[in-house]
Amino acid sequence: MDLGPLQAGRLPERLFTKSKRIDAAPALVLRDLARLDQVEISPRDGELVLIGRRHQRDNNSWMHNTERLTRGKPRHQLLMHPDDLASRGITDGNRVTVRSRVGSVEVEVKAADDMMPGVVSLPHGYGHQVDGTGMSRAAKVPGVSINDLTDPERLDVSGNAALNGVPVEVTPAG
C-alpha cells in the first residue's frame, strides 16, 4: 500500500503536550532520579548478576506455543561463564538452582565463553508448565520463568519490569 510521499511538519499536530514537542525528560522522571543513588549495583560475595535474553524464535512467550518455532536445539538454559561454573563445582549440562531475594528456579546450565564472568543469563518467555496457562504446546517446552526471580519491589526509574541486574546465587541442584 502506497500512502504517498512523507509530509513534513505533521508531528506537532499529533503531540498532545503544551509545547507540541516530545518531552524527553518529564518532571516526574527528573524528580525520581535521586532514587538511583539508592540502588545497590554490586552483587554481594558469591552472588552473580542475572540478565535476560531473547532469541528470534523466543521473542515473546506465545511463540513457544507453536511447534514450528520450538524446533531445533534447546535455548532454555542458564548461560554461565566457565570460570563461574568451575568455582562453584558445577559442570556444563548439570541442573542448578538459581535463587534471588524473591524466588528460586531449577534449570539446566550451559557454559558460555561469551558471558562475562559474574553474569548469568536466562531467556525470556519460558516456564509454561504452571497449571492454567492455556499454552498446551508451550507447557511441553523445557525452561523456567525469569519472572520467578525478578523483584517487583526493585527500584527502577523507568517503571518497567526489572529483568536485568538481579542479584542471584547459583548452586548445584539437589
Protein language model features and the residues they cover:
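Long, low-complexity segments enriched in small/aliphatic residues
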Residues: M1-R68
